[in-house]
Swiss-Prot record:
InterPro entries: Fmt, Formyl_trans_C, Formyl_trans_C_sf, Formyl_transf_N, Formyl_transf_N_sf, Formyl_transferase-like_C_sf, GART_AS, Met-tRNA-FMT_C
Residues bound to (6S)-5,6,7,8-tetrahydrofolate: 113-116
Keywords, in A-Z order: Protein biosynthesis, Transferase
Cross-referenced PANTHER family: METHIONYL-TRNA FORMYLTRANSFERASE, METHIONYL-TRNA FORMYLTRANSFERASE, MITOCHONDRIAL
Signal sequence, start to end: none
Protein name in UniProt: Methionyl-tRNA formyltransferase
Family label: Belongs to the Fmt family.
Summary of the function given for this chain in its UniProt record: Attaches a formyl group to the free amino group of methionyl-tRNA(fMet). The formyl group appears to play a dual role in the initiator identity of N-formylmethionyl-tRNA by promoting its recognition by IF2 and preventing the misappropriation of this tRNA by the elongation apparatus.
Pfam families recorded: Formyl_trans_C, Formyl_trans_N
Enzyme Commission numbers on file: 2.1.2.9
One MF term in the entry's GO annotations: methionyl-tRNA formyltransferase activity
Catalytic reaction(s) noted: L-methionyl-tRNA(fMet) + (6R)-10-formyltetrahydrofolate = N-formyl-L-methionyl-tRNA(fMet) + (6S)-5,6,7,8-tetrahydrofolate + H(+)
Entry GO terms, CC: cytosol
Length: 312
């Protein structure tokens, strides 16, 4: 089996899982690129990225440029390593053409959509939000564009009706190593394929997008909630307060149930009418509170006054 010298670039959990799996292969990880350490939490403690934690555990050189313009010496450090290939997944820093030109086989990006669909920052969320039944993993030869490079390998992944962005993220984290290792094994003979079809773009998520529109269908709302779980969380406004939603189910609606109205509130759930069904929320999170089952909320809060209230 072919043994390649690899520089790895990534930052969050999904990248860390791929890196862990790559360490279990025959390939040699020469260095790891990841974003600079950040101060996080109330105590503003410095935290390493998940990728840096994995690299340190495996005694690998870690490079953390703020950017390649501000830290151009990092490019020279990578050149000196003479990597066969650079593997990139969710690195989060723009790389210049001279970075792409360093390795013998170029730079491979692991992108979690079936390109050219959902190019950009939030392919997992946008695929669920759109109601797609399938998505996938593309191993792409990086070029100067935004996810525009030729495709070297793909793996289709089904989107279940219960999938959230978190569950789909976790699937991708486990599955990404398979098409990557296949690509590395066949890198001398694989024929890059130009992307086919009309591109769509997965624009960055904003917190405000979590707001639920109950005039839509229950299916659309289900996709919306699952797309924005766990972040930024789907929510509705109740008398000026933001209420985040948790677990839910879809029920049949009566002809006299008004769209956007709160139909009923019992220990079983908080029922809101959409344009075709009822969504029963089994969990809600009121401001400055934890996410709780409706039965637990009712133990300390009177919600009956909201029956008949129209959302939005």
């Amino acid at each position: 089996m072919k043994k390649l010298n690899i520089v790895f670039a990534g930052t969050p959990d999904i990248s860390a899982q791929v890196l862990k799996d790559l360490y279990q292969s025959q390939h040699n990880i020469q260095a790891v690129l990841t974003q600079p350490d950040r101060a996080k939490g109330r105590g503003k403690k410095i935290q390493f990225s998940p990728v840096k934690e994995v690299a340190i555990a495996n005694n690998t050189l870690v490079l953390q440029p703020l950017s390649f313009k501000k830290d151009p010496q990092v490019l020279e450090q990578i050149r000196e390593l003479k990597p066969d290939v650079i593997v990139v997944i969710a690195y989060g820093i723009i790389v210049p053409q001279e970075f792409l030109d360093i390795p013998k086989y170029g730079c491979l990006n692991i992108h979690v959509s079936l390109l050219p669909k959902w190019r950009g920052a939030a392919p997992i969320q946008r695929a669920i939000q759109a109601g797609d039944s399938k998505t996938g993993i593309c191993i792409m030869q990086m070029d100067a564009g935004l996810d525009t490079g030729d495709i070297l390998n793909t793996l289709e992944v089904e989107i279940q009706d219960t999938d959230t962005s978190q569950s789909l993220h976790d699937k991708f984290a486990k599955l990404s190593i398979k098409p990557l290792l296949e690509t590395l094994e066949n890198i001398d003979t694989i024929k890059p394929q130009p992307q086919q079809g009309e591109p769509t773009y997965a624009h960055k998520i904003t917190k405000q997008e979590g707001l639920i529109d109950f005039t839509k269908s229950a299916k659309e709302i289900s996709c919306h909630i699952r797309a924005f779980t766990p972040w930024p969380s789907a929510f509705f406004m109740l008398e000026g307060e933001q209420v985040k939603v948790g677990d839910f189910e879809i029920l049949e609606k009566s002809a006299n149930d008004e769209v956007t109205a709160i139909i009923d509130i019992t220990k079983n759930g908080f029922d809101i009418a959409t344009n075709d069904k009822i969504i029963r929320f089994k969990q809600l999170q009121f401001p400055n509170k934890k996410m709780l089952n409706i039965a637990d909320i009712l133990n300390g809060k009177d919600l009956d006054k909201y029956i008949g209230y129209k959302i939005g």
